[in-house]
Amino acid sequence: LIRENDTIAVPGEKPEESIAYQIAVQAVPELAEKELVAIPMPMTKNAKELEENHRRGAEKIEELLDAGKNVVFLTLGDPTVYSTYLYVHRRVLEDGYDARIVSGVTSFCAAAASLSEGLVENSEELHVIPASYQIEDALQLSGTKVLMKAGKKMPAVKQFLKEKNCRALQQQTINKNIITSHRDTKEINHHGKKENYRW
């Protein structure tokens, strides 16, 4: 799709700095020659601000569609799992345009594969939990827990896991570097700085 279309929407203020772009351009070098359109998607829990950004993103894409362009929207992982793209997708559909989702590989599946680890086997359960919210109840569930989107709360999440003597993650922390350079760590204490993506 990237090769077949000339207009590529990229989440963020600066498309070339987007992790999604940096990964995609390695796989499809022709991407560097395409028209890149920035779709700002600030990470916030402010509902009004989110709504406004989703509206603006959809309008920008609709303007491109009205100009007769086919648009590919890059995103990390799979667009159906905690993806800001979904909000834009729904708006574009509601406004009468054609939009399709192409599945990708979730960050937690990519991380597990890079560690040569399985997430679940046989009758085990898998729970995907947004870690920037309350996680205590979810950690009581049986099976494997995938903690995503911890963001600024990662130090608090790590502390909580240590206090609860939690072994659900087997102390495996993955940040965005797993995606670009396949670096990983098995220490919950390893990172003192802000991290973006982990399971």
Task: Give, region by region, the residue ranges found by the protein language model.
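Class I SAM-dependent methyltransferase SAM-binding "motif I" and its flanking Rossmann-like core
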Residues: T80-L141
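Residue-level preference for the first positions of well-ordered beta-strands
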Residues: G68-V72, E125, T144-V146
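A contiguous loop/helix-start segment that scaffolds small-molecule binding in enzyme catalytic cores
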Residues: P11-G12, L139-E187, G192-W199
